[in-house]
Amino acid sequence: MPKMKTKSGAKKRFRVRPGGTVKRGQAFKRHILTKKTTKNKRHLRGAVTVHETNMGHMAQMLPGQGI
């Protein structure tokens, strides 16, 4: 059986934490920021974790990562 391949787009966008959770960046932060309030942009800072309902998809895209 051949090796399972990691989705190259997923490995650039997600990081697996030691506890098995997956870290991701926030969306809606790249452009068209002038119409967004400062408070809205502030809340989009930093990274968040992938929701547990999407962890099955993460495990398929990132095999061998201990998810």
From Swiss-Prot:
GO terms for molecular function: structural constituent of ribosome. Keywords: Ribonucleoprotein, Ribosomal protein. NCBIfam families: rpmI_bact. Residues 1-25 are annotated as: Disordered. The gene is rpmI. GO terms for biological process: translation. Residues 1-16 have a biased composition (Basic residues). Coiled coil: none annotated. GO terms for cellular component: cytosolic large ribosomal subunit. Belongs to the bacterial ribosomal protein bL35 family. Pfam families: Ribosomal_L35p. It comes from the Bacteria. This is Large ribosomal subunit protein bL35.
